[in-house]
Swiss-Prot record:
InterPro entries: RNaseH-like_sf, YqgF, YqgF/RNaseH-like_dom, YqgF/RNaseH-like_dom_sf. SUPFAM superfamilies: Ribonuclease H-like. Belongs to the YqgF nuclease family. One of its GO terms (biological process) is rRNA 5'-end processing. This is Putative pre-16S rRNA nuclease.
């Protein structure tokens, strides 16, 4: 098991959640949620957190249909991952994110009821779930 810092993204066409984690502990925490327009974020905001955290690896959630097939947003998430690599030179891993948003909503509701279910919290928590799920698959 290595001690890499890993950043996770929950890609969406209107909002993108971010989380940061350590491979050695297999845990992550939410960082932020960024507004996007048709899947395109404000790259200066993304650059800021990448410079601040300097991740060794970035995991991008891959939105698939429940049967494992791809959908339009799957292609957009792959483009986002490719742009992250191209702009910042970071190593990228794609990870199946099916049901991460459902799990994030359940987790947040359990902790704080309906008030905790704002979109930013859900997206950042989804990024945590994607990242921790990726850690589990590695070991």
């Amino acid at each position: 098991m290595s001690n890499r810092t890993v950043m996770g993204f929950d890609f969406g066409t209107k909002s993108i959640g971010a989380a940061i984690g350590q491979e050695v502990t297999g845990t992550a925490r939410p960082l932020a949620s960024f507004k996007a327009k048709d899947g395109i974020p404000d790259w200066s905001q993304i650059e800021k957190i990448i410079k601040e955290w300097q991740p060794d690896l970035v995991v991008v959630g891959l939105p698939l249909n429940m049967d494992g097939t791809e959908q339009l947003v799957t292609t957009q998430a792959k483009k986002f991952a490719n742009r992250l690599h191209g702009r910042f030179g970071v190593q990228i891993a794609l990870h199946d994110e099916r049901l991460s948003t459902v799990e994030a909503r359940a987790h947040l509701f359990e902790q704080g009821g309906y008030r905790s279910l704002d979109k930013g919290s859900v997206d950042a928590t989804s990024a945590v779930i994607i990242l921790e799920s990726w850690f589990e698959r590695q070991y």
